[in-house]
């Protein structure tokens, strides 16, 4: 019996980061996503649709400190900087792909404060995993 699976790209993890990576790979690639248990056990699912976004430059230092503190200062500082600086572009990409984030009456993104964050920088959707598009070239196992 041959249990070999052939794929162009293997992604470990089926949370938002894994899905975002899959969405940004070339369309001709066959993608296999694997998870250690089930998709409903991912941190993205458990976060109930919330994700952080840098609202303005004045919030950067506080956002950076909150993230470092939440990671017990074991985080890679350059990775944290990249995550924070790219957050608005990631949100734009997700909106362009159909993610529906909560909005204020004027149409702007609605921000809340959760977890270790010292200010409102969490945007959310109900059940993020249901609003991020996938397609037939992505297999989740």
Per-region residue spans from a language model:
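Glycine-rich active-site loop/strand segments that organize a redox cofactor
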Residues: 53-82
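Conserved small/polar residues in nucleotide/adenosyl-binding loops
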Residues: 128-134
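Terminal amphipathic helices with adjacent charged low-complexity linkers/tails
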Residues: 104-127
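N-terminal Rossmann-like FAD-binding beta1-loop-alpha1 element of flavoenzymes
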Residues: 9-32
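A short alpha-helix-loop-beta-strand transition element characteristic
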Residues: 44-45, 74-81, 91-109
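Glycine-rich FAD pyrophosphate-binding loop
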Residues: 28-45
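A short, basic/flexible loop-to-alpha-helix module at the beginning of a structural domain
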Residues: 1-4
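Hydrophobic alpha-helical segments, chiefly the membrane-spanning helices
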Residues: 138-141
């Amino acid at each position: 019996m041959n249990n070999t699976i052939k794929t162009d790209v293997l992604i470990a993890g089926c949370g938002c980061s894994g899905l975002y990576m899959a969405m940004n790979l070339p369309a001709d690639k066959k993608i296999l996503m694997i998870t250690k248990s089930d998709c409903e056990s991912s941190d993205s699912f458990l976060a109930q649709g919330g994700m952080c976004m840098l609202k303005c430059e004045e919030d950067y230092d506080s956002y950076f400190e909150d993230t470092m503190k939440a990671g017990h200062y074991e985080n890679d500082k350059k990775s944290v900087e990249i995550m924070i600086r790219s957050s608005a572009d990631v949100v734009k990409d997700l909106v362009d792909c159909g993610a529906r984030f909560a909005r204020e009456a004027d149409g702007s993104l609605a921000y809340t404060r959760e977890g270790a964050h010292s200010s409102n920088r969490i945007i959310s959707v109900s059940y993020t995993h249901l609003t991020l598009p996938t397609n037939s070239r992505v297999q989740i196992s």
